[in-house]
Amino acid sequence: MSNTSNGKANKGSKMQMQRITAKKNQHILNEILSDKLIWLAPIEEDNYREYQLNNAEIIKILGLPKGIFKGFWPSRQPQWDGIAISEKKVLYLFEAKSHLSEIQSSKSKKQELIRMRIDEVANEIAGIKPGDDCKRNLWYHNYYQIANRIVFKEKMQGLAEISTVYKKVVLVFLNFVNDTSWKDSKKMVKSSTEWEEHYLRIFKEMGVDKDSLQSRNIYIKYFDVENLV
């Protein structure tokens, strides 16, 4: 999501994420994920702040040593829409969307270090080789946000071996249905099927499929905001 400021949101996926993580609604994702989540962010007590995983406080909470990300990624990392730890020692990372165009990323030039990390994961998950510039560019640019979230999920899973807090990582792309907060009603996604078809097309272009992602604990979930209180 593009709006990364702190504070209570009044529209879009940022607002819906704040609503679904509110105490009165926390049972919803617990039921969807069959787990009990303890939210690190966004929470009202912390002014709904969103965090990068290299934040010193987050690193400490996750039981990881300082400097663990040195040389892995530039200091400006992805900022997560939601971070939670569960009673089962699972680290949950959330990327939230409430309209289709939020998935598309800019085509800005990426640093060599970023491209290298994406290449590693794209090769491992999708079998994309260095010479396949067409598919690689989709990971670098068009679907960069999806790509970098997958990269960090894999990184955090590797770090689970040394964490004292979590042993497994789950990445959730959480997509909201019937978000009427958008002034442009054309942006509103009216069914989970619409989201499903959109993701299936994207995954096909990226050279991955839903089943292979789920085998790596990467899930696409949908929720109708009309069911929030």
Regions found by a protein language model. Name each.
Residues M1-L62:
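A structured, charge-rich N-terminal accessory region that forms the first stable segment of a protein
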Residues Q18-A22, F72-S75, L138-I146:
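Aromatic-acidic/polar surface patches that form glycan- and anion
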Residues L53-E87:
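Active-site metal-binding core of divalent-cation-utilizing nuclease and nuclease-like domains
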Residues Q77-D81, K89-L93, H141-Y143, K168:
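Extracellular structured ligand-interaction cores
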Residues G82-A84, V90-S98, R149:
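Conserved catalytic cores of phosphodiester-cleaving nucleases, focusing on short active-site segments
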Residues S98-N175:
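Catalytic cores of nucleic-acid endonucleases
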Residues A147-V229:
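Non-catalytic C-terminal interaction segments of nucleic acid-processing enzymes
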